Amino acid sequence: MKKVTIRDFIKKKSMKEKITMLTAYDYPTAKIISNTTLDSILVGDSLGMVVLGYTNTLNVTMRDMISHTRAVARANPPQLIVSDMPFLSYEIDVKSAVKNAGLLVKAGSDAVKLEGGEEIKDIIRAIVKAGIPVMGHIGLTPQRFLRLGGFRTIGKTKQEEEQLIKDSLELEDAGVFSIVIENTYVDIAKRITEKLNVPTICIGAGPYCDGQVLVIHDLLGLSEVTPYFAKSYVNLKEIISSAINQYIIDVKTNKFPEKQHYKERES
């Protein structure tokens, strides 16, 4: 599989070919993904919740994102690597936003993702001008859950719906190569997708987007709580627990280690 680029994203939209994206936060996971035909890996700030044990993404730092981006990049996957810019890494001023985006690219990312609408269009424009591809993110933006009043579906009012449409158009105008739409109503996501020339990637926004993204821990059945919009394709939590329990039994009953697991001196 050849390296996926942002041009491939645009091409897939024009050909009506769905884009596939999953999160990954470490080398082993990225190595497994590298042997599949997945289009893109998202090194998401969701690592704060599914890897680091925080209750939200606000505690994730640039140091965290750089470290995990490097781990994923070391697997040398052909997938497009997109790294989240964490909370307060781009909101303060344009200069620091461009610098932080550059640090993620130096760590091995092919593009960065920013949460927000028209209020960050100038920041996006500056990052793109610096030569760094940007993916937008509208709808439920977890870094802004305090302002949104919690993790909720966005677009319940006509005002929210029209703001989402406006945000998507402003982000496209600012130069994003694609936009994640999270946790909004299916008709709104469809409307946005039809209006834009750049592809949309949905998570909890229905089947009419140009692609889908999931947190890999949800897909593998490893999450403590799986969101309603995610699908678990296997229950690894149960499989891992069973393996650990069997290991405990084998050690206590002297079934492990067996002869093939150690060396004896030759007499």
Curated annotation (Swiss-Prot):
Question: Which positions form S-S bridges?
Answer: none
Give the co-factor note: Binds 1 Mg(2+) ion per subunit.
Secreted among the record's keywords? no
Spell out the GO cellular component terms annotated for this protein, sorted alphabetically and separated by semicolons.
cytoplasm
GO annotation, biological process: coenzyme A biosynthetic process; pantothenate biosynthetic process
Kindly give the InterPro entries that the UniProt entry links to this protein: Pantoate_hydroxy_MeTrfase, Pyrv/PenolPyrv_kinase-like_dom, Pyrv_kinase-like_dom_sf
- Quick one: which residues bind Mg(2+)? D45, D84, E115
Positions contributing to 3-methyl-2-oxobutanoate binding: D45, S46, D84, K113
Cofactor(s) it depends on? Mg(2+)
Q: Does the keyword Transport apply?
A: no
Keywords (A to Z) from UniProt: Coenzyme A biosynthesis, Cytoplasm, Magnesium, Metal-binding, Transferase
Catalysed reactions, as listed in the record: 3-methyl-2-oxobutanoate + (6R)-5,10-methylene-5,6,7,8-tetrahydrofolate + H2O = 2-dehydropantoate + (6S)-5,6,7,8-tetrahydrofolate
Please list the GO terms describing molecular function.
Answer: 3-methyl-2-oxobutanoate hydroxymethyltransferase activity; magnesium ion binding
Pathway recorded for this protein: Cofactor biosynthesis; coenzyme A biosynthesis
State the active site: E182
Q: What is its main location?
A: cytoplasm
Instruction: Give the EC number.
Output: 2.1.2.11
Q: Where in the cell is it found?
A: Cytoplasm
A Pfam family (short name) is Pantoate_transf
> What is the annotated quaternary arrangement, including any partners?
Homodecamer; pentamer of dimers.
- HAMAP family for this protein: PanB
Q: What does this protein do?
A: Catalyzes the reversible reaction in which hydroxymethyl group from 5,10-methylenetetrahydrofolate is transferred onto alpha-ketoisovalerate to form ketopantoate.
Similarity-based family: Belongs to the PanB family.
For this entry, the protein name equals 3-methyl-2-oxobutanoate hydroxymethyltransferase
Organism of origin is Saccharolobus solfataricus (strain ATCC 35092 / DSM 1617 / JCM 11322 / P2) (Sulfolobus solfataricus)
Lineage at the top is:
Archaea, Thermoproteota, Thermoprotei, Sulfolobales, Sulfolobaceae
